[in-house]
Amino acid sequence: MAQIDVDVFTAKVLSHWDWSREDRSFGDSASSPESESFDSACSSPDARSSPTAGCEHAEQQKPKVKMSMRRRMKASEREKLRMRSLAEALHQLRDYLPPGYSRRGQPLTKIQTLKYTIQYIKELSGILEQQ
């Protein structure tokens, strides 16, 4: 293994090392850095043919920062509220559309609601222009 390959591998191993734990174990598992092969440390399948190809890409990416449980819960709640608000707005749009736009009592999909609303507004605009 060339010196640069060892340096890249060492940097990769150290970036995954869990420095917060007392026993200084590697990552979340009980495996040691020695059990991690060079090929598996590189994310690209090209790593086997060119040892530095996969690691160069991995070196450029920043490691994912774990979101705290509280932040995830807040983000999830915000997303739920956003989706509820969107569903409410679409429901209101459906109420303004004439019954002829709905299919046999089935609710329109989101995209159908938007397309039919655009079509209906164009029709109303055309009527107003004629007057």
Curated annotation (Swiss-Prot):
Compositional bias annotation for Low complexity: 27-45
Tissue specificity statement from the Swiss-Prot or TrEMBL entry: Coexpression of ntl and spt is required for expression.
First-listed, main subcellular location of the protein, grouped into a coarse class: nucleus
Pfam families: HLH
UniProt entry tagged with the keyword Mitochondrion: no
This protein's name: Mesogenin-1
PANTHER family, sorted: IP14615P, MESOGENIN-1
SUPFAM superfamilies in the cross-refs: HLH, helix-loop-helix DNA-binding domain
GO cellular component, one term: nucleus
Region (Disordered): 22-79
GO molecular function, one term: DNA-binding transcription factor activity, RNA polymerase II-specific
